Amino acid sequence: VLTIFLTEDSKKKLNRDNPQLNLLKNVKIFYKTKKELDNYCSKDQLTHQSLVAEVKHVEQPILKEFIKKNPDKKNITLVILEDVTDPRNIGSIIRSAASFNIEGIIVKERSFPSESKLLYKSASGCMELINIFEVSNINTTIKYLKSKNFWVSGFDLKSNKDFTNHDWKGNNVLLFGS
């Protein structure tokens, strides 16, 4: 977090004196009116709760480098999102993936809204907890992962298989989208 903008009312709720709770120790804080925060957020069609944070863009790793650095790691689980482009949906998936200890999410670089403030807001702080691998071609990436002993599982509403009965040991890729 680089900068925090908040209203005078939210200032009262912020405890900056307790070092154990002081997560904003080295962060610049500016006090604004609710209207100023509304104006700041309206251009991106965002809402706020009397607090707006300006964050540094998180540099994401490269998939092949990640695989090379973890050659002996077992039970890696990755998620591929194919043609999932809505920032709210992607943010929600990032939150879920972080809660299930997914190692990373693979997305097509041309259709991933990496600079979307709505994506960051929808991810609710989980962008920093999960690797996002941007790739140029999903099919080539799947072939590469298969060559590195990953099992790829696609999901279909009409399938008669129950994924909860599947043995998820080993390296897995969960494919969502079209």
Model-derived regions: residue spans:
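Histidine/lysine/aspartate-rich catalytic loop segments that bind and position anionic ligands
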Residues: 103-161
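Short amphipathic alpha-helix with an adjacent loop that forms part of the alpha/beta core around
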Residues: 64-71, 144-148, 164-168
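Short, glycine-rich nucleotide/cofactor-binding loops
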Residues: 78-88, 108
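N-terminal positively charged helical leader segments and presequences
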Residues: 1-68
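Amphipathic alpha-helical repeat scaffolds
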Residues: 85-93, 137
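Active-site/ligand-binding-proximal alpha/beta "capping" segment
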Residues: 153-178
